[in-house]
From Swiss-Prot:
Annotated TM spans: 91-111, 118-138, 156-178, 233-253, 272-292
Entry GO terms, CC: Golgi membrane
Annotated region (VTT domain), positions in chain: 147-256
Residue ranges, Cytoplasmic side: 112-117, 179-232, 293-414
Record comment regarding domains: The VTT domain was previously called the SNARE-assoc domain. As there is no evidence that this domain associates with SNARE proteins, it was renamed as VMP1, TMEM41, and TVP38 (VTT) domain.
Ranges per topology, Lumenal: 1-90, 139-155, 254-271
This protein's name: Golgi apparatus membrane protein tvp38
Family under the similarity heading: Belongs to the TVP38/TMEM64 family.
Subcellular compartments: Golgi apparatus membrane
Organism: Aspergillus oryzae (strain ATCC 42149 / RIB 40)
Keywords of the record: Glycoprotein, Golgi apparatus, Membrane, Transmembrane, Transmembrane helix
Amino acid sequence: MPADYTSTARALSLPTSPSESLSPADNDSYPPWSHLASGRSNPAHPSERPTLWKQVTHRLNETSQRMMAIWRRLSFWQKVGAAAAALLANLLGIGFLVFTGKVFIWLGPVAEQWEQSVVAYTVLWLCVFFVSFPPLVGWSTFGTISGYIFGVWKGWFLYASATVLGSTCSFVVSRTILSKFVNRMMERDKRFAALALTLKYDGLKLLCMIRLCPLPYSVCNGAVSTFPTVQPLMYGLATAIVTPKLLVPAFVGSRIRLLSEKGEEMSAGSKAVNIISIIVTVAIGIFTGWYIYKRTMARAKELEAQERADIRRSLQADHADRRPHHSFSEDPDVNTAATTLARDEEERLGFHDFDDDNVDLAIDDESGGENSPRLQSGGPYRDEFTDNDSDDVFKNGDGGEGETYGLHTHVRKS
């Protein structure tokens, strides 16, 4: 009866057990984009851009967690060595500050005499020049001393000229010494190769931004020299363009001398103006360096994304047409960097796994005789069986003792 059939079908369609919530393991079985879609469709959590304070605290928390994870992985003696190194660095920093203060106290009586001395000017210029080579330090201190002895403009010219020439020479020497290291990095490190490409196509602008960043001076000279796409003249030009920032230490040095020589004669207001000018100048320099650093990192990531997109399109086009990848640039340094990124992109796209259509079966006669199928055909052996071939492939046995064959797979280049 139809009525009984309908009621029976409805009864069978009911669940035999109450519905249960999915376990975490069941949730993990769903594809990841389903979670993303549900997250986007939830109106209870509107997307809001985090404030600067939240970004800073989040970054500090991430850094502290990363440092704690590294610390927990260290052995006992590694922890002892790390603690000793941190203590030594703090002691050296305090000692350097004390030494710098003693230098200005010692320079007080002789600053007026040395201001017109050519020998003092030359010696200080050479000091700035030589601290350009890593791992020497004291570049900022010499800039302040230049302003302390020779005033703002004369001290700035000394500081700027020695900085430009010193950084260029340091760049050339570091590149010569670190050439083997550069080659290894270009072939193995995809991040290094990406930054090398960004410096090639947006070189001068990005170099100027790097020179404005608050990075260790001599170490920066050696680090940038490892990028083969940066030329020495371009690096020297970028350093010369940003020399106006060197007015900051020269100005601070001149204000320190003014306060030390005429501090007793100044009124409280004049002292306050000079001290505030020093603080404001230093604060502007720090803020500018931090801002430029953030912009530099953002620009580097943007250029790297563009380079990767171009390489990805080239790889996809070559793979679709089944043709080999040609060189990316006539410049060998650029081509090496692009090839390193191309290998990384191939792994991401899955092109490193060759399909069966690109694999040929070749049987090479290891005896090297004239009857080798490879020698007769002039290329790899390919199976060309047809439906009409009904011979038993096992009827001839294993063959003679001298007929030994090697089985290899060859990947077609075309």
